[in-house]
Amino acid sequence: MKALFRFKSCLFDPTRRRNQLVSFSGFSKSSKSNKTRETTTTSKIQAEATAITSLFNEITEILGTDVVKLDETTRLRSHVSGAVSDNGVSVSCTEGVRQNAAMGFSGEDEKAQKVLHEEVDFSPVVHEITSVVRGDDVLVSMEDRLEKLSFRFEPEIVENVLKRCFKVPHLAMRFFNWVKQKDGFSHRVGIYNTMLSIAGEARNLDMVDELVSEMEKNGCDKDIRTWTILISVYGKAKKIGKGLLVFEKMRKSGFELDATAYNIMIRSLCIAGRGDLALEFYKEMMEKGITFGLRTYKMLLDCIAKSEKVDVVQSIADDMVRICEISEHDAFGYLLKSFCVSGKIKEALELIRELKNKEMCLDAKYFEILVKGLCRANRMVDALEIVDIMKRRKLDDSNVYGIIISGYLRQNDVSKALEQFEVIKKSGRPPRVSTYTEIMQHLFKLKQFEKGCNLFNEMIENGIEPDSVAITAVVAGHLGQNRVAEAWKVFSSMEEKGIKPTWKSYSIFVKELCRSSRYDEIIKIFNQMHASKIVIRDDIFSWVISSMEKNGEKEKIHLIKEIQKRSNSYCDELNGSGKAEFSQEEELVDDYNCPQLVQQSALPPALSAVDKMDVQEICRVLSSSRDWERTQEALEKSTVQFTPELVVEVLRHAKIQGNAVLRFFSWVGKRNGYKHNSEAYNMSIKVAGCGKDFKQMRSLFYEMRRQGCLITQDTWAIMIMQYGRTGLTNIAIRTFKEMKDMGLIPSSSTFKCLITVLCEKKGRNVEEATRTFREMIRSGFVPDRELVQDYLGCLCEVGNTKDAKSCLDSLGKIGFPVTVAYSIYIRALCRIGKLEEALSELASFEGERSLLDQYTYGSIVHGLLQRGDLQKALDKVNSMKEIGTKPGVHVYTSLIVYFFKEKQLEKVLETCQKMEGESCEPSVVTYTAMICGYMSLGKVEEAWNAFRNMEERGTSPDFKTYSKFINCLCQACKSEDALKLLSEMLDKGIAPSTINFRTVFYGLNREGKHDLARIALQKKSALVAQRTVS
C-alpha cells in the first residue's frame, strides 16, 4: 500500500526512473533538538561566509588583473521568446497558442465562420445585448429585458457578449444560464472556452468544474485550447495537483502534447516553486524533442537556481545555447543573473571563476549583474570594489552607479546614496531619470521636501527629460505638503511635455487627495480621466467612496457613483468587439502569470513588488530570539528599507509569531519617515485576532483611527471574522452594528463573514444568520456557493428545512443558478440523514434533471453508505457511469470510509486502484480518511505511509488532517508520535488548538510519560506567549 499513493511518475516513461533528476523523499523532518539545529546552522553560516570572502578576494584579483576587450557582439541582448524552427527562425509560443485556438473547429466550420464574418457584422447586435447584460436597472431584471430583444442568439454573438463581460463574471454566468435555455442554442466549444477563461480569471474553480461537467453532459468535445485553458487556470490558482491531473487527462484524450501544453505546465510549476516537478516535465520534453522559448528557460533557471542543484542549473544553461541558438556568453549571463536574484552569491562567484578559466570575455553587463546581486545581498563594500575595477577598465557608467545608489537607498542610507550621486555628476555622465526619481521619493518620505524639489529642478536644468513616474513622485511630494495647487501645476506639465499621464499616475494623485479629504479635487480628476478616455478602476471608486463615507460626505457620493456609471458605459464602448478586454483572457494562456509583466516605466519604484529576500530576512530575525531587546537590536542593524508593503508581507508570513510581529509592527511605526497604511493595520488586526488577543486587536483598531488611516468594510470584516471564529458571535454582531452606526454600508465580504461565523457550530445563532442573509439579498448582493452551502447546511442541521427550501426561490430570483442551489440543499439533507426527503426533492425537481443528477449523485451515494445500503450506492454509481458520468473523488472517498468501517481492507485497496486507473486525484479529505481508517484497523505503519505519501504527491496536510491523526495516535497509545506531530504543525506555521494539546497531554499521562506530558504543556504555554502581546 505504501507505493499505492506515491507520486505518479507514470506521467512519464517508466524507463526513465533510473536517471530521475529529482527525488521526492526529502519531506521527512529531522528530530534533532532546536538548540543543536541552531548551533549547526550558525556554524554553517560562518563557514559559508568565510568561503565566500575567500572566493570573492580570488575573483577580484582575477578581474582586477585581466584585460577586457569590449566586444559589442557579446553583450547581453533580448531575444524573441520562442522555440526555434528547423530553418533557424524563432517561433513564438504565443503564436503556437493562437494556432491551437484555431483548431477548436473542423476545417469546414472554419470556412463557414470565415464566410459568416465576411457577410455579417455582428458588432451592433453584440453591443446592444451587452448594454442589457451590463445595464443597471433595478426595476426590470436582465432576463426580462433580454426576452424583449428580437435577435437570434447565434454562437458568435453569444461568445462576443461573454468576452465583453470578462470583468463581471456574475453577469456573464447569468447571461450564459439564460441563453442556453433558448431553443436552438448551440453548445459550441468556443463559448465554453470563453466561460472557462472568465471563471478562471475570477478564481471561481467551482464554476470551472461545473462548466467542464456541462460540456461532457452536452457532448461538447474539448479542443486543445480547452485543455490549455484548464491547465492555465489551475496553475494560476496554484492547484498543482489538479493541473497535473488535467495534463494527464489531455494525454489520454488523444491530443498530442505540444510545446504549448508543456510550456504552461512548466511555468505553473515554476511560479508555485515546484522546481522538482518542473524538471521532470522538462526532461520528458527533451526526450520527445519538444522545445520552448527563451522566456520559459529563464523562469526555469530562476526556479532551479534557488535549490542546491547547481549542476542541473548549468545543464539547463547548456540546453539554452543548443536549443535557443544563443551564445554561451548570453546563456551564462542569464545563469549569473539567476544566481544573483536567488541570493546565491557563492555560486555566482564560482561561475565567474569558471568563465575566466574558459577564457570567456566578461563585458560590462556581467559586472552590472554581479554588482546588483551583491547589493541585494547587502554586500555594499564588495559591490563598490567591483565598481572600482570597472572604473579602472573604463567600463563604469551611470547605470552601475544607479544600482549602487539603489542599494544604499534600500538600506535607508540616503547620505551615502547622495555621495554616489555626486560621483556620477563629477564623472561627466548624466544620471538616469530612474535614479533621480528614486532619490526624490526617499527625500519626500524623510520630509526633506525642498531637497526633493531642488533635485527635480536640477534634472530639468541639466536637460534630462522627466518621465511620468518622476513627475508623479513630485506630485505626491507636493500633496504630502498639502500644496494642491502646485501639485496640479506639476501634473499638468506632463501633457505640456508630451507625456500622457497613466492610470497609475492618476490613482496615486487620487489616493493622496483622499488622505487630505480633497473630494472636490478628486471629482475634478475623475472628470479629467473620463474626458481623456482613461478607464477608472472600480477599486479606485471604492477607495474614494469609503473615504467619503468615513468623513460624512454623503452628498458627494452620489456624484462619484454617477461618474462610475459613465465610466462603466465607456468601458463597454472601449471593448468594441471584445478584443480589448478579452486580450487578458488570451494572456491566461500566452503570458500566464509571468513575473516579468510589471514594467518599471509604468510603476514607481516605491510601489514595486516586495523583495522576498527582505521579507525572509526580517522573519528570520523575528524568529531568532524570544528576547525582544535582542530582536530590536538586530532590527536596528538591518539594512532593509521598511515600507508598508514589506510590513504587510512580514505580518502575513510570520503571523503565528504574533507577539514578535506585533512588537515589530509597533517598532517600525515609530521610525522616522515611515507611516503605516490601511493594509498594514488590517493585517496587524488579523494577526492579533488569530492569536485571540482581542484586547490588542481593538487597541490597533483605535490606533488606526487616531492615525487617520482609512477604515473600510474590510477592516470591520476582519474583526467580525476573528470574534466569530472563536465563538464570540454576540460581539461579532455588535461589531457589525457598530460599523453601520458609523455610516459604512456593509459590503458582500462583510455580510459573508458575519453569516459564516453565525452558521458555525461554535457560537451558532440561526435567527441572526437568517436575518443577516435576508438583508444581504435585499441589498442586491449575490452570495457565492460557499456561503450558500454554509447557510443551507446550518438551517438543515437545526431542523429548519422549511426555511432552507423557501430560500431556494429567493436565490433563483437574484441570479444564483437554480440547479446549484438545489444540489446544495440536497447535499445538506443527505448530511443530516434525511435521505428520503433528499430523494423526494430530486424526483420533484422541474428544471434540468440530468445536470442536477450529476451535481448530487455523490451526496446521494454518501447518504446511502451512511445508512449501510452498499448495494444501492453501487447501483447509483453504475447508473451514472452508464450515462457517461464517472465517479468523482467525493464518491471514492465515501466508499473508502465505508469499507474501512466494515473492515474490508481488500475493498479499500481495490477502490484506490480504481482511482488511479481513472486518474482521479485523491484530495486531502481522501488521505485523511485513509489515515483514520488504517488507525482504526491498528495499522499504524500504513497510516504513517499514507501521511508521508500525501506530502510527496504535493498535497499538504491541513489542520483537520493533523487533528484527526493526533486523536487516532493518542487512542492507539502512540501519544509520543502525536507530540511530534504538534511540533511539525508549529514548524509549518499551523497553530495547534487547545484541544490538540489537551488530547496529547492526557494521552501521555495515561501512558505514564509524565515528563513528555509536561513538555506538551510547555509547548502550549510557549505558543500562547508567542502569539499574544496583552
Curated annotation (Swiss-Prot):
Q: Tell me the domain of life.
A: Eukaryota
Residues in PPR repeats: 188-222, 223-257, 258-292, 293-323, 328-362, 363-393, 397-431, 432-466, 467-501, 502-536, 677-711, 712-746, 747-783, 784-814, 818-852, 853-887, 888-922, 923-957, 958-992
Q: Among its keywords, does the record have Cell wall biogenesis/degradation?
A: no
Task: Tell me the Pfam families matching this sequence.
Answer: PPR (PF01535), PPR_2 (PF13041), PPR_3 (PF13812)
Signal peptide bounds = none
Assign the protein's first listed, main location to one coarse class. mitochondrion
NCBIfam families reported in the protein's UniProt record = PPR
Protein name, per record: Putative pentatricopeptide repeat-containing protein At5g06400, mitochondrial
Q: Which organism is it from?
A: Arabidopsis thaliana
